[in-house]
């Protein structure tokens, strides 16, 4: 009888996980390469992962996320806004907290080439006088805030605040394979104090657990998911290892060390790391990343990519990240990105001056290997080997 009850509870827990499929598409970088525009783009837009995380203390109501940092984003999902629903392709980004999409208020070419939310076509839209601005490159995305029904998978939130863009200058969005961004970080870093989507889901009782989880498939097109309100154990092996969040803004944790072949190569006295679905690559201090690139034989090409011979993958060592006493090895098949006959390093350097010392960003390169649970109720991350 007890076993029947347990099985019933397990079945119930699976039923209340709201799964949102993600599709893997060509990144903005790949689109620009195909059109022969990447070199021109990089002359005026310099991707710097650090700018996504540290200018926010300077601006109380203006978000200063550098949108060039979505240059390599590949995983996208569909949401709808309004009544009747208007569909948008977005990045589910654990490294930011705002939801915004292009709108009919925007007349720039970048907006014209993407889906635009039309508030006049929604019977449930409520406007505000509040503004939103996100700076990037040579200009900024400016917009206004409004409320409407937002549907994410099977979850319908009837009172969600979001940004409607009015200007989107430059090439950053012209060829972007997404319309907007849905932030899943903590509300403390939300621009204009806008309540993040997941916080609203929980506050309104739309999910049964105050957590969400992410599975990123290595499949070229399908299989990836964001799961709201629960955990599906069929997407990982072994047990989840829990890591306390060290800063309740980003999904930031303390990492013990980074090693190769048993030798510590970085983060010798522990360091901070941010687990970020909105960052495609694995990012660390420039000196440490440069040493790793040299070790694995990667060298920059004319487009600034760190290329490597595909034949070397089988002979390269694991990069081991030790977190909360548990080792998380990253094999070369994970940190070397292969497309057709070309191979590039999935590692990227950045310099950040923080009071906590060196900082690493564990992006999609890491998350593809490790199923990740973002547990807001207990302010912790769960990690387990992905299937």
UniProtKB/Swiss-Prot annotation:
Residues with Phosphoserine modification: 129
Broad class of where this protein is predominantly found: secreted
Cellular localisation: Secreted
Domain Peptidase A1: 75-384
Sorted UniProt keywords: Aspartyl protease, Digestion, Disulfide bond, Hydrolase, Phosphoprotein, Protease, Secreted, Signal, Zymogen
Position of the signal peptide: 1-15
Keyword Flavoprotein: no
One annotated GO biological process: proteolysis
Any matching Pfam family: A1_Propeptide
Keyword Hydrolase: yes
Disulfide bonds: 106-111, 267-271, 310-343
EC class name: hydrolase
Catalytic activity, EC: 3.4.23.1
Reaction catalyzed: Preferential cleavage: hydrophobic, preferably aromatic, residues in P1 and P1' positions. Cleaves 1-Phe-|-Val-2, 4-Gln-|-His-5, 13-Glu-|-Ala-14, 14-Ala-|-Leu-15, 15-Leu-|-Tyr-16, 16-Tyr-|-Leu-17, 23-Gly-|-Phe-24, 24-Phe-|-Phe-25 and 25-Phe-|-Tyr-26 bonds in the B chain of insulin
Residues that make up the propeptide removed upon maturation: 16-59
Top-level taxon: Eukaryota
Active site as annotated: 93, 276
Any one Gene Ontology cellular component term annotated for this protein: extracellular region
Gene Ontology molecular function: any one: aspartic-type endopeptidase activity
InterPro entries the UniProt entry points to: Aspartic_peptidase_A1, Aspartic_peptidase_AS, Aspartic_peptidase_N, Pepsin_A, PEPTIDASE_A1, Peptidase_aspartic_dom_sf
Family: Belongs to the peptidase A1 family.
Function text: Shows particularly broad specificity; although bonds involving phenylalanine and leucine are preferred, many others are also cleaved to some extent.
Stated name of the protein: Pepsin II-4
